[in-house]
Curated annotation (Swiss-Prot):
GO terms for cellular component: cell periphery; cortical actin cytoskeleton; lamellipodium; nucleus; perinuclear region of cytoplasm. InterPro entries: ADF-H, ADF-H/Gelsolin-like_dom_sf, GMF. This is Glia maturation factor. PANTHER family: GLIA MATURATION FACTOR (PTHR11249:SF2), GLIAL FACTOR NATURATION FACTOR (PTHR11249). Disruption phenotype: RNAi-mediated knockdown results in not severe delays of border cell migrations in stage 10 egg chambers. Simultaneous RNAi-mediated knockdown of GMF and flr results in an accumulation of F-actin in follicular epithelium of developing egg chambers, border cell migration delays, and in deformation of bristles in the thorax. Simultaneous RNAi-mediated knockdown in border cells of GMF and flr enhances the accumulation of F-actin foci. The gene is GMF. One of its GO terms (biological process) is actin filament debranching. One of its GO terms (molecular function) is Arp2/3 complex binding. It comes from Drosophila melanogaster (Fruit fly).
Amino acid sequence: MSDNQICDISNEVLEELKKFRFSKSKNNAALILKVDREKQTVVLDEFIDDISVDELQDTLPGHQPRYVIYTYKMVHDDQRISYPMCFIFYTPRDSQIELQMMYACTKSALQREVDLTRVYEIRELDELTEEWLKAKLK
């Protein structure tokens, strides 16, 4: 663990990140990570294949932060299809301050591991819509 990082990243998460990045899935997919407060470690919360943005919104807890690595099947105006991958840091305004700090202080280390350039932050679940994501990915 580095000096500016509160939580370690579990080996399971590192393996799942590697598998997720090199997956050949043709669907939207989400790798949802959370902080195990007692162990101060980032752990796998859930992997969901074939999940829409709306379903992802319904899956995330209302009052607890999460890290989401999301692959989105994007159909461009010229009908090309791409699968951009992004890192979404979800931290609800009303979550516990201690939890917000743990997530915020670990975010940079996780971003380095994920190695994605598309990094977004949302504070409310209703911000996470397909329109929002498409606008960010353009």
